[in-house]
From Swiss-Prot:
One of its GO terms (cellular component) is chloroplast. Belongs to the bacterial ribosomal protein bL20 family. Binds directly to 23S ribosomal RNA and is necessary for the in vitro assembly process of the 50S ribosomal subunit. It is not involved in the protein synthesizing functions of that subunit. NCBIfam families: rplT_bact. Transmembrane segments: none annotated. It is found in: Plastid, Chloroplast. This is Large ribosomal subunit protein bL20c. Its main location: plastid. One of its GO terms (biological process) is translation. HAMAP family: Ribosomal_bL20. Keywords: Chloroplast, Plastid, Ribonucleoprotein, Ribosomal protein, RNA-binding, rRNA-binding. GO terms for molecular function: rRNA binding; structural constituent of ribosome.
């Protein structure tokens, strides 16, 4: 049988996959089958880790706020601070509170005083 030259479609698909794998090492960079497997694996990991990143950052913010409230004796605990914020309808998310707690603890103290005064 004579050899049938393939069209450009398969080559275009492979070069597209190869462009995704440009930073891989070894066979994961050179062999087409390995490239497709590893690129699929990388997409799965990136999709999973986008959700995980949100959880991790939320945990980090909560830890920072909790540490700051205990160190600067703003409240007894993080949960009491958040409870009073919701009770007084002060709209501050955890990211903003963590930023305040890390960069300028005096502002965290004034926020807590506002909560206590409203009580």
């Amino acid at each position: 049988m004579t050899r049938v030259p393939r069209g450009y479609i398969a080559r275009r698909r492979r070069t597209k996959m190869r462009s995704f794998a440009s930073n891989f090492r070894g066979a994961h960079l050179r062999l087409n089958r390995m490239i497709t497997q590893q690129v699929k694996r990388a997409f799965v990991s990136s999709h999973r880790d986008r959700g995980r990143q949100k959880r991790d950052f939320r945990r980090l913010w909560i830890t920072r706020i909790n540490a700051a409230t205990r160190i600067y004796k703003v409240f007894d605990s993080y949960s009491k601070l958040i409870h009073n914020l919701y009770k007084k309808k002060l709209i501050l998310n955890r990211k903003m509170l963590a930023q305040v707690a890390v960069s300028n603890p005096n502002n965290l103290y004034t926020i807590s005083n506002k909560i206590k005064i409203i009580n």
